[in-house]
């Protein structure tokens, strides 16, 4: 088994290194030199106040991208207008919900976005903090998502609604929520005692069913709910 030996340096001149007990090995000398180069009073940890939410991370994490806003913040760039709160945390007026994916990307280099967050929101933050590699990654993810969505077959929802002639105008006004007429079928007249006959129709309407990236459909609007209620009463 190989043995490690320290190679001693020549004793320091009088007055230099007197408190270190004479000559030092090269390895120990290099370690002491590295410690001497670290600025005194500078902590390894950095506290951020992003939109009222606190984040604690290391300078090494924030300095991953030398061109980013966070790198300049850690370097105390005089051209960067930054303030601190009463706890000493850097104040950043941004959405803390979307800062989480940005910070985690700097920590481990992977983009992880929760299902309740939009890729466009993460892209907005990546551009604000000027993290070029993250910007490219999110844009690629958005293109991939849009490509999958465009390749999905279009589905339609159909409703058959019964209405009288005088209700047709109101029916038309409810079509602006993506619903459109497919067919109008006359089914004769309804007999109202003492009143004129009212022509009745069956209205066939349809709407495209859009899927979200996670396979769920969007919630129907108020107009869509009205149409669905009319169809269910038939």
From Swiss-Prot:
Residues 213-234 are annotated as: Disordered. GO terms for biological process: proteasome-mediated ubiquitin-dependent protein catabolic process; protein homooligomerization. Keywords: Acetylation, Cytoplasm, Nucleus. SUPFAM superfamilies: POZ domain. Residues 44-146 form the BTB domain. Residues 220-234 have a biased composition (Basic and acidic residues). Homopentamer. Interacts (via C-terminus) with GRASP55/GORASP2. Interacts with CUL3 and with ubiquitinated proteins. Interacts with CRY1. This is BTB/POZ domain-containing protein KCTD5. It comes from Rattus norvegicus.
């Amino acid at each position: 088994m190989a043995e490690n030996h320290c190679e001693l340096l020549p004793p320091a001149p009088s007055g230099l290194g007197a408190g270190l007990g004479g000559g030092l090995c090269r390895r120990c000398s290099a370690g002491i030199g590295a410690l001497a180069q670290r600025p005194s009073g500078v902590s390894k940890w950095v506290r951020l106040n992003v939109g009222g939410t606190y984040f604690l991370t290391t300078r090494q994490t924030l300095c991953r991208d030398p061109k980013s806003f966070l790198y300049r913040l850690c370097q105390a760039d005089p051209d960067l207008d930054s303030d601190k709160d009463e706890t000493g945390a850097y104040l950043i007026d941004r959405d803390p919900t979307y800062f989480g994916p940005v910070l985690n990307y700097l920590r481990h280099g992977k983009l992880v976005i929760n299902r309740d967050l939009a890729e466009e929101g993460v892209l907005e933050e990546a551009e604000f903090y000027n993290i070029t590699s993250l910007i490219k990654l999110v844009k690629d993810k958005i293109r991939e998502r849009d490509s999958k969505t465009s390749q999905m077959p279009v589905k339609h929802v159909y409703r058959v609604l019964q209405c009288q002639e005088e209700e047709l105008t109101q029916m038309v006004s409810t079509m602006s929520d993506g619903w459109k007429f497919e067919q109008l079928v006359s089914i004769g007249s309804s007999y109202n005692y003492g009143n004129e006959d009212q022509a009745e129709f069956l209205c066939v309407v349809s709407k495209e069913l859009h899927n979200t990236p996670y396979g769920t459909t969007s919630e129907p609007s108020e107009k869509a709910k009205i149409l669905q209620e009319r169809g269910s009463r038939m």
